[in-house]
From Swiss-Prot:
It catalyses: S-ubiquitinyl-[E2 ubiquitin-conjugating enzyme]-L-cysteine + [acceptor protein]-L-lysine = [E2 ubiquitin-conjugating enzyme]-L-cysteine + N(6)-ubiquitinyl-[acceptor protein]-L-lysine. E3 ubiquitin ligase that, together with UBE2N and UBE2V1, mediates the synthesis of 'Lys-63'-linked-polyubiquitin chains conjugated to proteins, such as IKBKG, IRAK1, AKT1 and AKT2. Also mediates ubiquitination of free/unanchored polyubiquitin chain that leads to MAP3K7 activation. This is TNF receptor-associated factor 6-B. It comes from Xenopus laevis. Belongs to the TNF receptor-associated factor family. A subfamily. The gene is traf6-b. It comes from the Eukaryota.
């Protein structure tokens, strides 16, 4: 039951019958109901007003349209398993039973006392409804039939949607066989090369790695199967580039395999000089260092120019020169080792200082969070039961909801007075795929553990007014508003045993997201939600049971 309530004036209500009918219709989807917080709520897409959808009325299109006398005042659909009350009203059996258990033993239309055992089947209405003509709900089907024959028709209707067992998509029954055999991306096929079974959509990836698929050599353009290609590159391909066989001695030339023989013939003298330089390096290197020489590094030995004559033994370095060079290297190593020790010590000191600073920063962050929480708590103490929740960045929340990601946020806690009950609000943007509540704003109130819980009577008794404020500038301002009375028998209003009661109380379909565009409910990307709580009992000075005031002892 959503209403538009102007702040500037109060509109007169409709007749009692219309009001009662609206209240009854709200019991199913559009009114307050006990709802778990997201950690314990039903999955998104499941109607939170009923755990099993089938027990509601018949949600089909009648031809001609359904008469109001056959409509359930609760679910607003055609009566299913119609029952009648002593006061003459008809309901779906499941709808009225749930209403009696959740909302109390009274008729949702006229509030007359009503017990479950007073309900009796209305076979006349049931027979009349089953005889009404309905249209097939399958898109493309134009057949009509009596309601009693609808289920049998759906089992045979070629336009009825059925699920593909391979890709879980929905398709008309007439197209399912063609889809599964020729169109489904998950249909089973076999690789023509290796015979491996796979899904059709995986074939493109398999073709890139299939070991028996034919591929073309990028050098000689020979066609071979993929698993033969490595050996072809390394041994057979005449066009593949290979290094010179003297690359370990310093030759950096690369050529095609069929040009290797010519290269060896043309560069014979150069290869001999490279080998000579390598041997000469061995003769001048201490024995302990010979093992450190790598023959795999072509840059280690530079080729000798062709104009350079062979080295004469008199040009070779003496033993004294080698000893002096060794001493110089040792001194350099000692200096570097000392520098390394000093730098290691400095690094350890810097790490210790950084850890100290990190600890200090974490303590400051904790202090800041604590102060922020205290500031919010102070604001909650002084709201006196009228709390306005400012939600910034609402467009970002809507974008997340459009991506089928759940959006659930909680407000800071606030008190109904001092002393008073501590409450908070929960806002939930229903996903586009949710049944019967898609794209709705859900709004709930949760009790929280507060400072005065031991001084207050439980459960909570009072009236709660929830509003989404209109931020338009003008004389006429229309807030989206709902008013509800607490229900002491629900867990949502019992004294909480955790920081926040997991049970909430409010509206699954408080306001549709499209309604936000009709007025300026969102301004500067900000939405305002107002909650006003009126406690029915005097919680400021509760009278204890059995307390008797004592008269004074007299003047002294």
């Amino acid at each position: 039951m959503s209403i538009l309530n102007p702040r500037t004036s109060l509109e007169a209500g409709d007749s009692d019958d219309a009001c009662c009918a609206a209240m009854a219709s709200a019991c199913c989807l559009n009114t307050k109901e006990d709802c778990d917080s997201p950690s314990t709520a039903l999955p998104s897409g499941t109607p939170q007003s009923l755990e099993v959808e089938e027990v509601q009325g018949y949600d089909v299109e009648f031809d001609p349209p359904l008469e109001s006398k056959y409509e359930c005042p609760i679910c607003l659909m055609a009566l299913r398993e119609a029952v009648q009350t002593p006061c003459g009203h008809r309901f779906c059996k499941a709808c009225i039973v749930k209403s009696l258990r959740d909302a109390g033993h009274k008729c949702p239309v006229d509030n007359e006392i009503l017990m479950e055992n007073q309900l009796f089947p209305d076979n006349f209405a049931k027979r009349e409804i089953l005889s009404l003509k309905v249209k097939c709900p399958s898109q493309g089907c134009t057949e009509t039939m009596e309601l009693r024959h609808l289920e049998r028709h759906l089992g045979q209707c070629q336009f009825a949607s059925v699920e593909c067992s391979q890709c879980q998509g929905s398709f008309p029954k007439s197209r399912l066989e063609k889809h599964m055999e020729h169109e489904c991306g998950r249909r089973k096929i076999f690789c023509d090369n290796c015979g491996l079974a796979m899904a059709y959509e995986d074939m493109s990836g398999h073709e890139l790695i299939c070991p028996l698929a034919y591929v073309t050599c990028e050098y000689c353009q020979t066609n071979l199967i993929r698993e033969q290609m490595p050996s072809h590159y390394s041994m057979d391909c005449t066009m593949a580039p290979i290094p010179c066989m003297y690359y370990e001695f310093g030759c950096t030339e690369k050529m095609q395999r069929n040009d290797l023989a010519r290269h060896l013939q043309d560069f014979t003298q150069a290869h001999m000089r490279m080998m000579f330089q390598t041997l000469r390096s061995f003769s001048t290197t201490p024995t302990s260092h010979i093992s450190d020489i790598s023959f795999c590094d072509p840059n280690q030995f530079e080729p000798v120019p062709l104009s350079v004559a062979p080295a004469h033994p008199s040009h070779m370095p003496s033993h004294q020169d080698c000893s002096q060079e060794t001493r110089n290297l040792r001194e350099t190593i000692e200096q570097l080792e000392g520098r390394l020790v000093r730098q290691d010590h400095q690094i350890r000191e810097l790490i210790a200082k950084m850890e100290t600073q990190c600890t200090y920063v974490n303590e400051l962050k904790h202090t800041i969070r604590s102060l922020e929480d205290k500031l919010l708590d102070v604001d909650g103490h002084h709201c006196n039961g009228v709390f306005i929740w400012k939600i910034k960045g609402f467009s970002g929340l809507q974008k997340t909801q459009e991506e089928e990601k759940p959006v659930v946020i909680h407000s800071p806690g606030f008190y109904t007075g001092k002393p008073g009950y501590k409450l908070c609000l929960r806002l939930h943007l229903q996903l586009p795929s949710a049944q019967r509540c898609a794209n709705y704003i859900s709004l709930f109130v949760h009790t929280m553990q507060g400072e005065y819980d031991s001084l207050l009577p439980w459960p909570l008794h009072g009236t709660i007014r929830l509003s989404i404020l209109d931020q338009s500038e003008g004389a006429i301002i229309q807030d989206q508003e709902e008013v509800m009375d607490t229900k002491p028998d629900l867990l949502a209003f019992q004294r909480p045993t955790t920081q926040r009661n997991p049970k909430g109380f409010g509206y699954v379909t408080f306001m549709h997201l499209n309604t936000l565009k009709q007025r300026q409910y969102v301004k500067n990307d900000t939405l305002f939600v107002r909650c006003a709580v009126n406690i029915h009992l005097d919680v400021i000075s509760p009278r204890r049971e059995g307390f008797q005031p004592r008269s004074g002892d007299g003047a002294q």
